[in-house]
């Protein structure tokens, strides 16, 4: 075996598990027996903190977005595919690991045309279009969550979403703090909208903060997303704790008693590792409604409560928060269920599965 490439483009939901897998593969270099390991990502991700801290060289490509000029898109796309072929041939790439998304297409096509090993990682219960298209060409597929349709035309296992080392808690067992309701302690609520932020969630929480009874029982820390920070700052109270972006999520997970978030696989996996109960507001316009499917998995397993809405009315979330504040046993049970859904060793398990290691 000569070289391995991990193709992780798109959003943080593809990049972070790709870098996590690279961390483990770097440690297993001698066991696997490869010479070189690379990450392959879109040029627009050059400032991504995970890629800036990657444990191996990062190669960049400029695959045009699907929204590009209708007439120029096929030409630009073909040129980038050819460039990928030349780069990978020069580097003697023998194994292609795709983390999902349209930006993996050129790399997977290389694997197909030159008969190289192809391994795929699928983060969602409803697979993305690109992975679905290429499942039959893959030697193995690692799912983060159980697929909704079990008829996958290749060898697959459900192993969890690879987590960065810096995100994994020191203790693999962390149960929810048992609250004494007589102390009337405030609950710490971490609010997240994913790697890009979420205007809907930000606005709902800002509206909640205007209710005095909510402020008495809950303390909010809102990760707004860099692009939405100024907007939220203007709308929120002066004492609101707002953070545009954080590269140290471990600190926030350890602070939180529960989470309000979207339901991308990365966020769900990290919250589960910290045994955090979740209130999930799935992105209503996600492809194939995959965020709702992810959220329902955690709800069915007792780790989450799903709030299904497209508007910014806070009344539904108000009722859920009131329920949680007055039922500590519910929170404790959700915490244990959340931990039971976790896969803190997903990175190592995925590497061992792909490369048939004991």
UniProtKB/Swiss-Prot annotation:
Main location: membrane
Pathway: Cell wall biogenesis; peptidoglycan biosynthesis
Catalytic reaction list: di-trans,octa-cis-undecaprenyl diphospho-N-acetyl-alpha-D-muramoyl-L-alanyl-D-glutamyl-meso-2,6-diaminopimeloyl-D-alanyl-D-alanine + UDP-N-acetyl-alpha-D-glucosamine = di-trans,octa-cis-undecaprenyl diphospho-[N-acetyl-alpha-D-glucosaminyl-(1->4)]-N-acetyl-alpha-D-muramoyl-L-alanyl-D-glutamyl-meso-2,6-diaminopimeloyl-D-alanyl-D-alanine + UDP + H(+)
Superkingdom per UniProt: Bacteria
GO cellular component: plasma membrane
Keyword Membrane found: yes
Disulfide bond residue pairs: none
Enzyme class: transferase
Subcellular localization(s) per the UniProt record: Cell inner membrane
GO molecular function: glycosyltransferase activity; UDP-N-acetyl-D-glucosamine:N-acetylmuramoyl-L-alanyl-D-glutamyl-meso-2,6-diaminopimelyl-D-alanyl-D-alanine-diphosphoundecaprenol 4-beta-N-acetylglucosaminlytransferase activity; undecaprenyldiphospho-muramoylpentapeptide beta-N-acetylglucosaminyltransferase activity
EC numbers on record: 2.4.1.227
Membrane topology: Peripheral membrane protein
GO biological process, one term: carbohydrate metabolic process
Alphabetical list of InterPro entries matching this protein: GlcNAc_MurG (IPR006009), Glyco_trans_28_C (IPR007235), GlycoTrans_28_N (IPR004276)
SUPFAM superfamilies hit by this protein: UDP-Glycosyltransferase/glycogen phosphorylase (SSF53756)
Keywords from the named record: Cell cycle, Cell division, Cell inner membrane, Cell membrane, Cell shape, Cell wall biogenesis/degradation, Glycosyltransferase, Membrane, Peptidoglycan synthesis, Transferase
Residues the entry annotates as binding UDP-N-acetyl-alpha-D-glucosamine: 11-13, 124, 164, 195, 291
Function according to Swiss-Prot or TrEMBL: Cell wall formation. Catalyzes the transfer of a GlcNAc subunit on undecaprenyl-pyrophosphoryl-MurNAc-pentapeptide (lipid intermediate I) to form undecaprenyl-pyrophosphoryl-MurNAc-(pentapeptide)GlcNAc (lipid intermediate II).
Family to which this protein belongs: Belongs to the glycosyltransferase 28 family. MurG subfamily.
Record protein name field: UDP-N-acetylglucosamine--N-acetylmuramyl-(pentapeptide) pyrophosphoryl-undecaprenol N-acetylglucosamine transferase
Gene: murG
């Amino acid at each position: 075996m000569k070289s391995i490439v991990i193709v992780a483009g798109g959003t943080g939901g593809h990049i972070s598990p790709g870098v996590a897998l690279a961390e483990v593969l770097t440690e297993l270099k001698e066991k696997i027996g490869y010479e070189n390991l690379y990450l392959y990502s879109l040029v627009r991700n050059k400032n991504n903190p995970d890629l800036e801290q990657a444990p191996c060289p990062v190669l960049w490509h400029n695959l045009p977005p699907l929204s590009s000029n209708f007439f120029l898109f096929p030409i630009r796309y073909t040129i980038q595919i050819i460039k990928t072929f030349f780069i990978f041939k020069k580097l003697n790439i023998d194994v292609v690991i795709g983390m999902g998304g349209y930006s993996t297409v050129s790399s997977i096509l290389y694997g197909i045309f030159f008969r190289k090993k192809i391994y795929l990682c699928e983060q969602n219960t409803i697979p993305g279009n690109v992975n679905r298209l290429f499942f039959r060409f893959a030697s193995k597929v690692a799912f983060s969550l159980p697929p909704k349709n079990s008829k996958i035309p290749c060898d697959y296992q459900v192993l969890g979403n690879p987590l960065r080392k810096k995100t994994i808690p020191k203790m693999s067992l962390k149960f929810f703090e048992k609250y004494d309701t007589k102390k009337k302690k405030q609950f710490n609520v971490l609010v997240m909208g994913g790697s890009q932020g979420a205007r809907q969630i930000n606005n709902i929480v800002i509206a909640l903060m205007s209710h005095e009874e909510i402020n008495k029982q809950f303390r909010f820390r809102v990760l707004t997303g860099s692009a939405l920070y100024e907007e939220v700052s203007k709308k929120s109270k002066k004492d609101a704790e707002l953070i545009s972006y954080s590269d140290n999520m471990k600190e926030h997970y350890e602070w939180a008693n529960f989470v309000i978030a979207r339901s991308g696989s990365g966020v769900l996996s990290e919250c589960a590792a910290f045994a955090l109960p979740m209130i999930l507001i799935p992105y209503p316009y996600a492809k194939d409604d995959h965020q709702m499917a992810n959220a329902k998995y955690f709800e069915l397993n007792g780790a989450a409560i799903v709030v299904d809405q497209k508007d910014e009315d806070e009344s539904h979330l108000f009722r859920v928060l009131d329920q949680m504040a007055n039922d500590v046993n519910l929170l404790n049970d959700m915490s244990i269920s959340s931990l039971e859904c976790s896969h803190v060793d997903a990175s190592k398990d995925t590497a061992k599965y792909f490369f048939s290691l004991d």
